[in-house]
Amino acid sequence: MASQSQFHPRFQPRNLTPAGKQINLSKEIQSAFMTYSEVYSKTLLDYQKRWADVIFDLEEKSLRMDILKQLAELLKNKICYHPPMFVEQPDLARERDQRVFIYLSREKMQKVLEEQSITVGMEAVLATTIQPYRSDLAVQEMLRVHNRAWPHRRMEERDLECFIAIFASTLFIHLTTLKVTNLYGREVDCTFFVRRASTNRPYDVVAFGTT
């Protein structure tokens, strides 16, 4: 089982640093999402099926093995955004893809990329549908809606320097939908999702860059 895990395919996130023109950034992000869902996901699902077959062949009788076999049954048909591991609540793909963005400081982005994760330690993760290529939103407005959506952790300007793009898993729950006011005075809806604090685990990042 351990040797199988060594061959788990990892997606190489698209590096969009430094950010180019907004229209180019938009196209690059959409292309990265398409590559993940249309190319990489097939390779990943094939791996998960092979891993599941290995688990089903194990004869060990224990609660731990029961949980692993339940996970294996899920992963035969459902994309998981982290390698197969002993968890009762895996980060599975939703029935309908939800593309979201997590804003963070340069230092934090570097750390999560090194750890191939989306968290630093055990912390909640706030994600939003606000795209990083939107040039009509002021930094202060971005700060306002982020802090209103999740007041448990106050964000500062440096926390908006960078972004990572991901598919939200089934563990991301809808938090709120707020209105942001753009530079032209028009109100636009933006949605926030939160993934509650959990043990740190790997998670596939689709793209990353500066804002």
Swiss-Prot record:
Annotated keywords: Hydrolase, Protein phosphatase
Record InterPro entries: Glycosidase
Enzyme class: hydrolase
Reaction(s) the record says it catalyses: O-phospho-L-tyrosyl-[protein] + H2O = L-tyrosyl-[protein] + phosphate
GO MF, one example: protein tyrosine phosphatase activity
Enzyme Commission no: 3.1.3.48
Pfam families: RolB_RolC (PF02027)
Domain of life per record: Eukaryota
Family: Belongs to the rolB/rolC family.
Role this protein plays: Induces differentiation and growth of neoplastic roots (hairy roots). Seems to function as a tyrosine phosphatase.
Name under which the protein is recorded: Protein-tyrosine phosphatase rolB
